Amino acid sequence: MTNKKAFKEACKFIAGGVNSPVRAFANVQSEPKFISHGKGAYIFDIDGNSYIDYVQSWGPLLFGHCDKDIQKACQKALHKGSSFGAPTLLETELAKLVLSDFPHLEKIRFVSSGTEATMSAIRLARGFTKKDKILKFEGCYHGHSDSLLVSAGSGAATFNSPSSLGVLEDVAKHTLVAKYNDINSVKELFEKNKDIACVIIEPIAGNMGLVPAKQDFLEELAKICKNNQTLLIFDEVMSGYRASYLGSYGINHIQADIITFGKVIGGGLPAAAFASRAEIMDILSPLGGVYQAGTLSGNPLAMAAGIASLTKAKKKTKLYDKLGTLAKKLTQGMKKLADEKGLPLQACHVGSMFGYFFTKDPVSNYQDALKSNLALFSKFHKNMLENGIYLAPSQFETGFICSKMDDKVIDITLEAVRESFKRI
């Protein structure tokens, strides 16, 4: 079966033919590739084509596809049972592994997705502060729970849908939206609203393309939250263990009240978490009145994969330097080639995360990101795919470097960039 036939068949039985909207390739006026398998830095579609994969399952695969250590850990766990709905030692082991490197985090709760993590963190913040409103930032995506699907990035930006049908106005009215990297917009909202339970932010935004928050902006944001008895939530579902081993904390050293984790923490399996100090976490059920639960939360396969992934990342002391060097080479190379062709391009990286926009102006917020030339992006994506490079099929997503990549892979990619720029 070909990719084209597979998508046509999928559309008969799966809504939209995919189980997450951006996978449909609609934003690049194309059809998705159906993947048969992956190995290291590469994926292979059912037509027999191979691609250097810069999506890496949208971030979780720090060590690329089919990493032997993670596979071995999963196989060992699977032989004992896939899920019990009861505590296992693996949950405590992964909890200790995560908390040991964050002095301000004392307890953690595992869930199965980033959406669950942020949704639960919001509920926890409201329960702890006894306040109703939440403040988020335009273009930041925190999963698809109702209160957070307001002025969202990621898929919502891809489909020009800042919110969603089905999100009740009575729910959305409790969500305040500020401008990313603009502290004055935050101050204005705090002046008008005295019942803000929490501020949630991607400290390294990866869902409007890659847009890191400025250090002084985050520092001032933390002060405002503290002065108003408002909890600060860092959504590190994407940036955790990606931007650095300690995510944004390893870069900006700001201690958020709650951190959400995901992607890498599950080593490629469905897992996420939220963590905070004990006085906050202890109001979760069964100790307190904030309810959160999940049938597969902390399941042994995901915990085993997470332990293997984080243990390996922690042991490889030069891993993040290598990934950052490769990401820098890629983004600087893209910028140089664009300049040579007279194409407007902004490109940047943070650790193993990278992004690019077809615009002449620097990008520091969602409105800047929206200025990117989407027609150019679409043409570029199509040409890169034809040249064997698999990039995220949306301008408003982030790319990822994995440990199986090297200078040769980047050189091949930059040659594909050169050829693609010639055609667009």
Swiss-Prot record:
What's an example Gene Ontology biological process for this entry?
protoporphyrinogen IX biosynthetic process
- Name its cellular compartments: Cytoplasm
Keyword flag Transmembrane helix: no
- Which reaction does this chain catalyze? (S)-4-amino-5-oxopentanoate = 5-aminolevulinate
Q: Does the keyword DNA-binding apply?
A: no
Main localization is cytoplasm
This protein's pathway reads:
Porphyrin-containing compound metabolism; protoporphyrin-IX biosynthesis; 5-aminolevulinate from L-glutamyl-tRNA(Glu): step 2/2
Query: Might you give the EC number(s) for this enzyme?
Result: 5.4.3.8
Q: Name one GO molecular function term.
A: transaminase activity
User: Which keywords describe this protein according to UniProt?
Assistant: Cytoplasm, Isomerase, Porphyrin biosynthesis, Pyridoxal phosphate
Q: Which residues carry this modification: N6-(pyridoxal phosphate)lysine?
A: 263
Gene Ontology terms, cellular component aspect?
cytoplasm
Cofactor(s) named in the record: pyridoxal 5'-phosphate
Q: Which HAMAP family match?
A: HemL_aminotrans_3
Entries under NCBIfam families matching the protein? hemL, PRK00062.1
Query: What's the family?
Result: Belongs to the class-III pyridoxal-phosphate-dependent aminotransferase family. HemL subfamily.
Q: How does it assemble?
A: Homodimer.
Its recorded name reads: Glutamate-1-semialdehyde 2,1-aminomutase
Recall the taxonomic lineage recorded for the source organism: Bacteria, Pseudomonadati, Campylobacterota, Epsilonproteobacteria, Campylobacterales
